[in-house]
Amino acid sequence: IFLKTPRLRGLLALNMAVAAASAMVIVNTVVLVQADFGFSQRSTAIALAFFGVGSMVSALVLPRLLDKMSDRMPMLVGTALLVIGLGLGIFLKDYVTLVVLWALLGVGYSLSQTPSGRLLRRSSTAEDRPALFAAQFALSHSCWLVTYPLAGWVGATWGTQASFIALTVVAALSLVAAVLIWR
């Protein structure tokens, strides 16, 4: 079902973009805040909280948006925000910009990810729904299995700016694939 349904194949592409953005945040926040900017563990927690706040704001607004439009539009807009946020990260120079960027990535993350349950329910019957949710879980985690090591390896080898570049490319290609697949 998953690979035969265009909107679910599009979701798989969006999963890769979401994984790219979350990999940058989860893997490299400590490096950016403590090693690059010289701030404390507390500042690291605050930066991660900004990502969470962005995600929560988006999740709170999303039900009203979904009453007025299909799942596709906010999911694609959210993924575009992830691409933009990762791309802007290439030019990151200070902590204040980082927390604003993390909030933007949180908004994009939630817009991209939150409607996926509705999409899965709409694409399945009661009998195949558990298998479809299990497939989504496995496939989304396989995206993380690629992007988390990529974020760390590129960052450790060539620096966080290179990690931003690599993950921006992954997210952008994933967005293009989603748009082309999910019409």
Predicted regions, residues:
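Helix-loop junctions at membrane interfaces in 12-TM secondary transporters
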Residues: 90-102
